[in-house]
């Protein structure tokens, strides 16, 4: 029973780190939610295009974001080991990586735009998707640099800085998006392009706030910022050794999800709009839990650096209590209120009944897997913080791509219909969560030898 007893101190620390990150990620979810709501006021096609274009742009960025965001765990490990001067050096190595990543991202984005036509999307949907996608890719370098600083502040447990920067960015984004979409307050009416431009401007604004925190005098003195602006091959080697598997996992998983979404949207406008509606609510549940995931990575990394495995176990238990408690409430709401939640995004039109019927069915599936999502984020945070990124990469990627192959036969070969495809998607998430829990219960990732390899800079 002692193993399952949760210490108040650990829970308090987790919540103090997680709360600002949940607010930050929640603000991001609100931004996406309002963007798509504004699009739905124009037409279901515009809303579907914002989903397809947004997911495709994140797909292109995901490899680089996955690598750069591992700064959270690296910084936390150095912070726990009391090597504060190395924390800011992690940021410098991340910025060095950005010099190569940004041109590569622009090239990848240029060729990725053709996927919309290859997947057989309706011409009117494809045109809007490409407009939204290419503008987001143009400003994607800002997002990569912002990831370095956000991950750093999470690693040193200064998540209030992340909350302030991201929340103020969203406060700017929402009215700016409305103005640039509909052409009010002296702005031109740009439609879906206006939403993309507003996203870039607000990201740049958030980055400026991060820079102000980073170069603040007391912070510069404590973490030796002025002495950190050098190439450190040892830290860079750790960054790539542990971060690349994390980036590859994110890239291939997002690729699999993106291809599934593109195939699902090829059913037609009703199915594309229904997917957009349900994933809007998925974001509301999933994105705030990413804040919990970030906090768990930070705390586990710190206790790995301190070599304090007892406190690490407490983080695991506390994370499960928070994650499953939050997601269980959402699961009940998604079932009980599925019809009014869907109706928010459905305007009167020729496809209204079809969109309502399919979306309500899909909301039940969302309620089914929301607790599995919480499990994935808690366990994934623990394993990433402990440096078990290779296992995560192999298992997660294999399961996602196996699902994609199954979906190809369901959607394209046997033409079994959108409800069957959605059930397959839900089952895949449940199976992945079960595999993660089995790994967490094992011993291989937390042996002294494994943890020593994680901390080594050679």
Where on the chain are the PLM-derived regions?
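Transmembrane helical elements of multi-pass membrane transporters/channels
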Residues: 16-35, 135, 169, 202-206, ...
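Short alpha-helical transmembrane segments in multi-pass integral membrane proteins
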Residues: 1-21, 75-141, 187-244, 300-368, ...
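Small-residue-rich hydrophobic transmembrane alpha-helices
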Residues: 47-110, 143-157, 161-162, 275-336, ...
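N-terminal transmembrane alpha-helices
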Residues: 6-37, 41-42, 55-74, 99-106, ...
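Helix-terminus/linker motif at the lipid-water interface of multi-pass membrane proteins
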Residues: 30-48, 116-123, 179-190, 251-278, ...
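Interfacial/gating helices of multi-pass transporter permease domains
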Residues: 39-58, 124-131, 192-193, 234-242, ...
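Short runs within selected transmembrane alpha-helices of multi-pass transporters and secretion channels
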Residues: 68, 72, 136-154, 162-170, ...
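Alpha-helical transmembrane segments and their lipid-water interface positions
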Residues: 28, 32-35, 39, 61-68, ...
């Amino acid at each position: 029973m002692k193993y399952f007893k949760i210490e108040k101190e650990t829970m308090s620390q987790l919540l103090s780190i997680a709360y600002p990150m949940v607010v930050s990620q929640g603000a991001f979810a609100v931004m996406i939610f309002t963007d798509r709501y504004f699009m739905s006021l124009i037409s279901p096609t515009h809303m579907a295009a914002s989903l397809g274009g947004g997911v495709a742009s994140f797909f292109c960025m995901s490899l680089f974001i996955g690598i750069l965001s591992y700064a959270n765990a690296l910084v936390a490990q150095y912070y726990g080991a009391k090597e504060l001067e190395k924390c800011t050096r992690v940021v410098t190595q991340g910025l060095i990586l950005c010099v190569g990543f940004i041109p590569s991202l622009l090239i990848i984005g240029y060729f990725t735009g053709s996927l919309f036509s290859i997947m057989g999307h309706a011409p009117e949907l494809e045109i809007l998707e490409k407009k939204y996608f290419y503008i987001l890719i143009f400003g994607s370098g800002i997002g990569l640099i912002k990831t370095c600083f956000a991950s750093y502040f999470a690693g040193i447990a200064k998540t209030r800085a992340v909350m302030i920067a991201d929340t103020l960015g969203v406060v700017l984004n929402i009215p700016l998006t409305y103005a640039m979409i509909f052409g009010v307050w002296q702005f031109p009416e740009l439609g879906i392009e206006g939403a993309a431009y507003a996203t870039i401007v607000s990201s740049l604004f958030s980055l400026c706030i991060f820079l102000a925190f980073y170069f603040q005098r007391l912070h510069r003195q404590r973490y030796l910022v002025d002495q950190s602006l050098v190439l450190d091959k040892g830290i860079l080697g750790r960054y790539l050794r542990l971060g690349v598997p994390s980036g590859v996992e994110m890239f291939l998983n997002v690729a699999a999800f993106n291809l599934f979404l593109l195939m699902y949207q090829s059913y037609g406008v009703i199915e594309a709009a229904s997917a957009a509606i349900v994933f809007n609510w998925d974001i509301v549940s999933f994105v705030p839990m990413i804040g919990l995931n970030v906090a768990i990575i930070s705390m586990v990394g710190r206790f790995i650096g301190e070599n304090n495995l007892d406190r690490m176990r407490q983080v695991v238990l506390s994370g499960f209590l928070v994650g499953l408690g939050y997601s269980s409430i959402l699961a009940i709401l998604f079932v009980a209120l599925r019809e009014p939640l869907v109706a928010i995004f459905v305007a009167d039109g020729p496809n209204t009944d079809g969109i309502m019927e399919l979306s309500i069915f899909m909301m039940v599936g969302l309620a089914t897997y929301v607790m599995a999502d919480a499990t994935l984020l808690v366990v994934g945070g623990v394993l990433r913080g402990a440096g078990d990124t290779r296992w995560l990469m192999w298992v997660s990627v294999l399961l996602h791509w196996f699902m994609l192959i199954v979906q190809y036969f369901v959607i394209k070969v046997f033409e079994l219909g959108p409800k069957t495809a959605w059930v397959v998607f839900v089952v895949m998430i449940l199976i992945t969560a079960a595999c993660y829990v089995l790994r967490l219960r094992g011993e291989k990732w937390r042996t002294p030898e494994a943890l020593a390899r994680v901390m080594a800079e050679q």
